[in-house]
Structure formats: C-alpha cells, structure tokens
Swiss-Prot record:
Pfam families for this protein: Cofilin_ADF
One term of GO molecular function: actin filament binding
Compartments where found: Nucleus matrix; Cytoplasm, Cytoskeleton; Cytoplasm, Cell cortex; Membrane
GO cellular component labels: actin cytoskeleton; cell cortex; cytoplasm; membrane; midbody; nuclear matrix
Tissues of expression: Expressed diffusely in both animal and vegetal hemispheres of the oocyte. During cleavage, expression accumulates around the cleavage furrow, along the vegetal membrane, and later in the midbody. Strongly expressed in the animal hemisphere during blastula stages, with most cells showing expression by gastrulation. By stage 17, expression is highest in cells of the developing neuroectoderm, and at stage 24 the notochord, neural tube, neural crest, somites and some cells of the archenteron show high expression.
Protein name: Cofilin-1-A
Keywords assigned by UniProt, alphabetized: Acetylation, Actin-binding, Cytoplasm, Cytoskeleton, Membrane, Nucleus, Phosphoprotein
Gene name of this polypeptide: cfl1-a
C-alpha cells in the first residue's frame, strides 16, 4: 500500500554522500555521516532529515564513545523512524563497512504512525538504491543488543561491530 509520501532531496543527498566511499581529506572525512535519522514532516507528506539526529565520523572518539549506542539513543521511544547506519564490522575473514537501512517501529508507537511509516517504507527504499541490509526493529531489547545487527550483517561470521566483540 503506497502512502503518497515524498522523499526530500536532502534525504537523497545524504544517502549518496554516505554511500560513496572515496578518498576524502581528513577534514572532509570528519564531516562524513555515520548515522542519520529520517522522520515525516509535520504535515506527514514528506520524509525529511530529523534535525539534530546524526552522528558524524569526526564525533567518534571525541563526544561519541560508542557510535552504535549513540545511534540507539537517537531513536524515539514512542514513534517510528527510518535511519541509515554505516556499520563498521569484522567477519572471520575481513573488515567491512556497509550501510544498513533501519525501519524503527516500536511497540509503543501509535497505530497511525506505524501504518504511515510502513506504507511509506517502499517510497524511501526506492530512492535509496544499492542498500545491502534492511533491519526492521520493534523493541528496544532488539536494538540494544548489537548481536542482532551483527546477525543482519552476516550472522555467525561477524565477530565485531564498531570494534567491539559481538560473540562471547
């Protein structure tokens, strides 16, 4: 079911910036986004960047100790969101970095919010081509455990996420 919701040009621009990994100057590399959260505009007609809900690569190690935990804290307890998370992980063979499209639909969100976000998900996904991983999350228990993201990225082959071990 399509909702008729549009995707803002800013969302597409941020996605393209996150998707392309090329040699950046040290200054530009610090400005590269690690995570962003998208929400619906007040009139519920456009998917937009949620103001202030981003993590920059340059923040990591300065005012962001654990990018994954910081990302989790950006998700509202009682409303839906979309997000992009640039996951840095290691498998038994190699280090990898992949974008993950996140659909956050917590149990505490209103039915109306869940319905409009669910029906608009295809609209945003069509505008963000080439994403390898999609993760729908409905509880804080699921999102708080980095092993769940590791499972989405490669199951038992993933040994660390953001430099932290995910397997005991």
């Amino acid at each position: 079911m399509a909702s008729g919701v549009m995707v803002s040009d800013d969302v597409i621009k941020v996605f393209n910036e996150m998707k392309v990994r090329h040699q950046l100057s040290p200054e530009d590399a610090k400005k590269r986004k690690k995570a962003v959260v998208f929400c619906l505009s007040d009139d519920k007609k456009t998917i937009i960047l949620e103001p202030g809900k981003e993590i920059l690569q340059g923040d990591i190690g300065c005012n962001v100790e654990d990018p994954y935990k910081t990302f989790v804290k950006m998700l509202p307890r009682n409303d839906c969101r979309y997000a992009l998370y640039d996951a840095l992980y290691e498998t038994k063979e190699t280090k990898k970095e992949d974008l993950v499209f996140v659909f956050w639909a917590p149990e505490e969100a209103s039915l109306k919010s869940k319905m409009i976000y669910a029906s608009s998900k295809d609209a945003i996904k069509k505008r963000l081509p080439g994403i390898k991983h999609e993760w729908q999350i409905n509880t804080y228990e699921d999102v708080n455990d980095p092993c769940n993201l590791a499972d989405k990225l490669g199951g038992n082959t993933v040994v660390s996420l953001e430099g932290k071990s995910v397997r005991s």
